[in-house]
Amino acid sequence: RKNVKAEQNAAAADPNWKYQKLQVGDKVYRDYDGHVHQEGVFAQLEWTKKNLNAFVSGSVSNTGYWRYDRFYYDAAHAESEHVNFIGYTVKGGANYNINEKHNVFANLGYISRAPFFSGGAFLQSTTSNAKNPDPLNEKVFSAEVGYGFRSGILSVNLNGYYTLWMDKSVVRSSSMANGDYARVNLSGVDARHMGLELDFVLRPNRWLDVTGMLSLGDWQWDSDSKGYIYDTQGQPQTKALDGTVASGIMAEDHAWLNLKQKGIKVGGSAQTTGALGITVSPMKGLRVSADW
């Protein structure tokens, strides 16, 4: 960040700016453009023979990022370095129909995708052209096996899955001593998801449908992770966490934390879910449903 200092930002200087009346065209906090360009190719092969059908697919892509910042940089340094990431996917699967009622299936996949623009390619994309010195593609490995049953009145699907998320970029937030919120960009985060899923549809007669599902999951974080701390304006914070701006991104005085999350359950969504529904159609044009 040559020709710009963090303390030149209004948010880091005299706080009286907060009470200044803005005019049309005034800029606060940030004024930048984020540019993303992508190119890719995809191919898929499908094969069917009697009761067996299978497929394999793959893709390769390039994702490029750069930003142009009119707020924190002069014109000579407004455009950041262009960064590019190669990603790819490999997927395959097969289904075998044992007979008219029973089938089994399996799927495998591996994905390597470009890191996100913010927190991945750039350390703090809202305020700085500083790129991540060690960006990593996010990877996903997933495997699934399952069984299906079909009859005149009952359809059932049962499957088990195992998924590994590797080198994820995750954002966390907390409060600081001055009452502002701290934003932490975590990278290199791993997680493991596995579980069983069951769903069914029962139609014992033409006027009654019964549907249900059950999902049992075990999702947990598989690694600890390190992240640097910023305020809500995107400014790097010192270890005092009182709103004082650090001398630079990833500088010696830039606060960071090591999040001890290995073995902790992944939050944000239920890992055990169930549902049951009944639909009654006593006459043409009338339907009554109840769901739990």
How would you label these PLM feature ranges?
Residues 62-71, 82, 96-143, 155, ...:
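Surface-exposed extracellular loop regions of Gram-negative outer-membrane beta-barrel proteins
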Residues 42-44, 53-57, 91, 103-105, ...:
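Residue-level detector of the transmembrane beta-barrel scaffold of outer-membrane proteins
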Residues 1-99, 124:
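Signature of Gram-negative outer-membrane beta-barrel scaffolds
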Residues 48-51, 162-164, 184-292:
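Gram-negative outer-membrane beta-barrel transporters
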Residues 49-51, 60-64, 108-114, 123, ...:
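Transmembrane beta-strands of outer-membrane beta-barrel pores
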Residues 37-43, 60, 88-92, 104, ...:
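Hydrophobic, lipid-facing positions within transmembrane beta-strands of outer-membrane proteins
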Residues 2-27, 76, 124-133, 172-185, ...:
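Surface-exposed loop/turn segments flanking beta-strands in extracellular/periplasmic regions
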